[in-house]
Amino acid sequence: MAQDRKKVLVLGAGYAGLQTVTKLQKAISTEEAEITLINKNEYHYEATWLHEASAGTLNYEDVLYPVESVLKKDKVNFVQAEVTKIDRDAKKVETNQGIYDFDILVVALGFVSETFGIEGMKDHAFQIENVITARELSRHIEDKFANYAASKEKDDNDLSILVGGAGFTGVEFLGELTDRIPELCSKYGVDQNKVKITCVEAAPKMLPMFSEELVNHAVSYLEDRGVEFKIATPIVACNEKGFVVEVDGEKQQLNAGTSVWAAGVRGSKLMEESFEGVKRGRIVTKQDLTINGYDNIFVIGDCSAFIPAGEERPLPTTAQIAMQQGESVAKNIKRILNGESTEEFEYVDRGTVCSLGSHDGVGMVFDKPIAGKKAAFMKKVIDTRAVFKIGGIGLAFKKGKF
């Protein structure tokens, strides 16, 4: 019986990969399959909380927990390694710690920052990408305030922050900044009126997923707390001084001591090296989340471009979708092991909430708009539910937002 065991290999312990494994370990026995999870870090981090850790309103350690803390060690073999190559036909995955065979593969390698080729953006701007970048950014912001307070010759740029992008991540980061700035001003004796936060967005509208009414609420709330918006203003370069933007065909330099890029992500760069037809690290999947020509390879999360039947555009890359994909794949792997056909993935949109710091927010929940404290509360519910779905009540109690 043991020789008939299938080898299930899961790459990545983000929302999609970890949800797959935690559901699968409950659904199958050790006689049915050998599950191996490979992740480059020993920890999982809540990617949707990175804006808080980046602003310094949440300690970076509160964003992460050990991967093995949610695994059944008799069911899952965890390997801390970096994936370097996926060989679909040989059914092998190469890592910096060795080569692993598979019968069924789940690719959930997550995202990296996408700067769209903007000159200097990778070199001179902080990225909201992982817990390491979050820790670096929050420390840098505080260091700038400390330096301003200690310097005899004040540099106002120490108190100036540029944020590129007024999408979900950018706006949530701005909200956290408006919570953090008063604390820093109080700690270092800085006049808050001297702090300048500017958000630059190339598109004609911020938060394009929300109605004008919700967007106006977000803009008003953040502007009242000191944020200046430059909408329909493309960033053409980033340098050590800040952003270079284009206004009416002319280039302008915006100066700041801190530049942050929060305007784009893409799937893992390993995707282009491993598969054909990949765009920005994402591959179009079939309706059951496998890829063309390979019924034994699932691709989910940030690396997946899933187009629902009858639709033209793929679903966005969100934690909610990634976790639902993980559940679906776990069920389908169980079906494959039972000799049954796979089922199509059906996404259930339970709503989206964008936080504006810890006390306000905007969102759509079950097709109803919400804003203010109600939205802020709902965001905490969503964050806590995500932890509960993977780690149960114990992890939710330890890491949740209540």
UniProtKB/Swiss-Prot annotation:
GO terms for biological process: aerobic electron transport chain. Its main location: membrane. Keywords: Cell membrane, FAD, Flavoprotein, Membrane, NAD, Oxidoreductase. This is Type II NADH:quinone oxidoreductase. Binds 1 FAD per subunit. GO terms for molecular function: NAD(P)H dehydrogenase (quinone) activity; NADH:ubiquinone reductase (non-electrogenic) activity. Its EC number is 1.6.5.9. It is an enzyme of class 1 (oxidoreductase). The active site is at E172. Its cofactor is FAD. It is found in: Cell membrane. GO terms for cellular component: plasma membrane. Belongs to the NADH dehydrogenase family. Alternative, nonproton pumping NADH:quinone oxidoreductase that delivers electrons to the respiratory chain by oxidation of NADH and reduction of quinones, and contributes to the regeneration of NAD(+). FAD binds at G12, A13, G14, Y15, A16, N39, K40, V83, D302, A319, Q320, K379. It catalyses: a quinone + NADH + H(+) = a quinol + NAD(+). Pfam families: Pyr_redox_2. It comes from Staphylococcus aureus (strain MSSA476). SUPFAM superfamilies: FAD/NAD(P)-binding domain.
